[in-house]
């Protein structure tokens, strides 16, 4: 994860040591950057002013870990609720082959059909979850949406909108 400063046209690394930063969200006060880590199935909370951190190292804490799916897009609402969308469901095949980097790498680069067979979300799998950033409590799980994965999430007022892979329409849920 890198930060670009347009004033002096510089690029600096904020966070390294992650296996796929698939989503970013910045807290309303601008102090905390949340980073979804696709490879480790977790969300990191990072001091937004920090530089050159390593995931799991000093001053970089895991905000959520052991998630039921592979986190993708992140979004924060005005109440400090973090919405985590799941790009894929937790895969027993990937879990079993966690230490086989080559196999995992090939699977994550496979075509859409193969990925759907390995990681696709079932109708009862969570496609997104809502977490209170103040205390880390789980607020809500969004399930029952048979889709290839949730690629985007956007809270707006009393609704949350979901961009579903393979869907031509936008899905929503009341909160």
Model feature map: region roles:
Residues 1, 41-43, 90-92, 128, ...:
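Structural signal for beta-propeller blades
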Residues 83-85, 129-130, 138-143, 152-154, ...:
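Conserved active-site loop/cleft motifs that coordinate metal ions or position small ligands
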């Amino acid at each position: 994860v890198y930060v670009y400063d347009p004033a002096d046209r510089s690029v600096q690394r904020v966070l390294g040591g992650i296996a796929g930063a698939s989503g970013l969200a910045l807290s309303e006060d601008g102090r905390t950057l949340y980073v979804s880590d696709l490879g480790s199935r977790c969300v990191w909370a990072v001091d937004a002013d920090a530089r050159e951190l390593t995931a799991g190292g000093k001053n970089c804490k895991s905000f959520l870990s052991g998630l039921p799916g592979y986190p993708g897009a992140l979004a924060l609402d005005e109440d400090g609720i973090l919405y985590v969308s799941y790009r894929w469901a937790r895969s027993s095949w990937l879990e079993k082959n966690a230490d086989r980097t080559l196999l995992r790498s090939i699977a994550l680069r496979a075509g859409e059909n193969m990925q759907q067979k390995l990681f696709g979300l079932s109708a009862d799998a969570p496609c997104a979850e809502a977490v209170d950033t103040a205390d880390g409590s789980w607020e809500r799980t969004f399930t029952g949406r048979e889709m290839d994965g949730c690629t985007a999430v956007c809270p707006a007022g009393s609704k949350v909108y979901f961009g579903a892979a393979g869907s031509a329409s936008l899905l929503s849920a009341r909160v």
